[in-house]
Amino acid sequence: VLGSLCLYFWGTWWFLIIYLAYCTWWGGADAIWHECGHRTAFNSKKLNDFFYHIGSFMNSFEAVRFRWSHSLHHNYTASIDPHDFEVDGSIFWKPKKLINFLMIFIPGFGLLNLNKSIQKEILEHAFGIQTKVMKECIPDHKKSSCIFISRIYVFIWLIIIGSSILLNSFLPILMFLVPKFFATLNIVWRLTQHMGLQEDVKDHRLSTRSVRLNPIFSFIYWKMEYHIEHHMFPSIPSYNLPKLH
């Protein structure tokens, strides 16, 4: 619905408001990736894996890399060694300047900082470059799969860019390539999980945080605001986390 409204209001000021709502909903794929990655969204393993790959692409979370880095994240939450790449204290969670932190909440700012983006990592993997996360998280027998899927992502990106060129319109890029960069509300929700909490502790109550969200945000986020509960009992489906809380 939001996508159709974006098309209808393209070229008007209304597009900007609707597009930000569209991007926020698109960012909800973070929850799809996460829940299906734990294989708790559906009873069927095939359905979980199918939607895991869709959610992964929408988030630019390469599926193999994030399956292994997320496993490490649960086993060693906010750990320095082994390094928890999903709670990266030195780069993202504790910026040296307040202005650098505040700027990540500006819609589209990530497009100006691609050098530190997850998209750059996918490009590196697509070219067969072994990054720090590949060396430390991904088993040797899975590295070729990571490279292969990264190449699929890049190929789809090129198709989207080519479509924009052929149609002489930015719409394909705006609708399918860059929504993640404008989903700033999703950044706020994600930051609540571990930011400012203790590192290198085994007690999830000290390294993880649960918060309250309004019903709409909670629906988009798939109840992942109950994050302490999720880390303590990761096999419980997200829709049961409020009851567990």
Say what each PLM segment does:
Residues 41-60, 82-98, 202-214:
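Juxtamembrane helix-capping/reentrant segments at transmembrane boundaries
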